[in-house]
Amino acid sequence: MNLRQQLTQFLTMAFVFSSSFMAWKTLSVVTNSHSPVVVVLSGSMEPAFQRGDILFLWNRQRQNKVGDVVVYEIKGKDIPIVHRVLREHHNSEKQYLLTKGDNNLVDDLGLYAKKQGYLNQATDLVGTVKAYLPKVGYVTILISENMYARYALLGIMCISSLLTGE
């Protein structure tokens, strides 16, 4: 492979990565969410959502209502949580939410940060679930939880790259 082909291959890969990044950032701006697509990681929302479902979020509504499925983050924890709004109250400017997983026995007070009784809709929510694809995200769970699957995927990608020259 000559220098021109290698440079073309590099530029093609750079274009693919930059296009993917721009598509993600555009989706983030449109949905007003830093993470507009999430994968369900646990069974706490069964039967509504199963582990591995991909959820599409929207974060442009001013208020959430009881029954909405929301994704929120706790300060100091990296993993977003998908649960249903159990109770809400608000004052003139802020809305506060109490959530619970459909498959859980108790509400989420024990999950919230210390001395936090409710979620602040403006600061804690990543978004409200508007659509989903069942089981499609299970591949990401398999790769993140299984070291052998990760190495197998990496090996397949390397072999494919060597054989096709791309």
Swiss-Prot record:
One of its GO terms (molecular function) is serine-type endopeptidase activity. GO terms for biological process: signal peptide processing. Residues 152-163 are annotated as: C-terminal short (CTS) helix. Residues 31-166 are lumenal. PROSITE patterns: SPASE_I_1, SPASE_I_3. InterPro entries: LexA/Signal_pep-like_sf, Pept_S26A_signal_pept_1_CS, Pept_S26A_signal_pept_1_Ser-AS, Peptidase_S24_S26A/B/C, Peptidase_S26, Peptidase_S26B. It is found in: Endoplasmic reticulum membrane. One of its GO terms (cellular component) is signal peptidase complex. It catalyses: Cleavage of hydrophobic, N-terminal signal or leader sequences from secreted and periplasmic proteins. It holds the Pfam family Peptidase_S24. PANTHER family: SIGNAL PEPTIDASE COMPLEX CATALYTIC SUBUNIT SEC11. Catalytic component of the signal peptidase complex (SPC) which catalyzes the cleavage of N-terminal signal sequences from nascent proteins as they are translocated into the lumen of the endoplasmic reticulum. Specifically cleaves N-terminal signal peptides that contain a hydrophobic alpha-helix (h-region) shorter than 18-20 amino acids. This is Signal peptidase complex catalytic subunit SEC11. It comes from Meyerozyma guilliermondii (strain ATCC 6260 / CBS 566 / DSM 6381 / JCM 1539 / NBRC 10279 / NRRL Y-324) (Yeast). The gene is SEC11.
